[in-house]
């Protein structure tokens, strides 16, 4: 008797996606940080756009625009805190992602590793421009 999950057309799709997944069986939770980085980046971009709609960078009105965001904008305080804490979470996930790469020897793949190092420097430069310089 043949196995139904390997012969039925719809069950074959489910089988190849969930049951016989072509992934190593020893994959751990350390491999989730790439997707967590993507989620943190999307949160940063969206909250940054909403904050930029109400922020004024003029030295005379910058503080009052931040208080306007926190007091007058609907859930502005939440957007501001999500943006601030999302940046911290982004860098925690980023450093854990790099640490996982070091632990599992991903530096042996030179082209991929060098692109990752360039991305790390670009992220750090962007964070410097957005946090330290204003």
Curated annotation (Swiss-Prot):
It is found in: Mitochondrion inner membrane. Its cofactor is heme b. Heme b b562 binds at residue 83. The keyword Transmembrane applies. The chain crosses the membrane at residues 33-53, 77-98, 113-133. One of its GO terms (biological process) is mitochondrial electron transport, ubiquinol to cytochrome c. It comes from the Eukaryota. The keyword Nucleotide-binding does not apply. Pfam families: Cytochrome_B. It is a multi-pass membrane protein. GO terms for cellular component: mitochondrial inner membrane. GO terms for molecular function: metal ion binding; ubiquinol-cytochrome-c reductase activity. Binds 2 heme b groups non-covalently. InterPro entries: Cyt_b/b6_N, Cytb/b6-like_sf, Cytochrome_b_N_euk/bac, Di-haem_cyt_TM. Heme b b566 binds at residue 97. Keywords: Electron transport, Heme, Iron, Membrane, Metal-binding, Mitochondrion, Mitochondrion inner membrane, Respiratory chain, Transmembrane, Transmembrane helix, Transport, Ubiquinone. Component of the ubiquinol-cytochrome c reductase complex (complex III or cytochrome b-c1 complex) that is part of the mitochondrial respiratory chain. The b-c1 complex mediates electron transfer from ubiquinol to cytochrome c. Contributes to the generation of a proton gradient across the mitochondrial membrane that is then used for ATP synthesis. The cytochrome bc1 complex contains 11 subunits: 3 respiratory subunits (MT-CYB, CYC1 and UQCRFS1), 2 core proteins (UQCRC1 and UQCRC2) and 6 low-molecular weight proteins (UQCRH/QCR6, UQCRB/QCR7, UQCRQ/QCR8, UQCR10/QCR9, UQCR11/QCR10 and a cleavage product of UQCRFS1). This cytochrome bc1 complex then forms a dimer. Belongs to the cytochrome b family. Heme 1 (or BL or b562) is low-potential and absorbs at about 562 nm, and heme 2 (or BH or b566) is high-potential and absorbs at about 566 nm. This is Cytochrome b. It comes from Sorex hosonoi. The gene is MT-CYB.
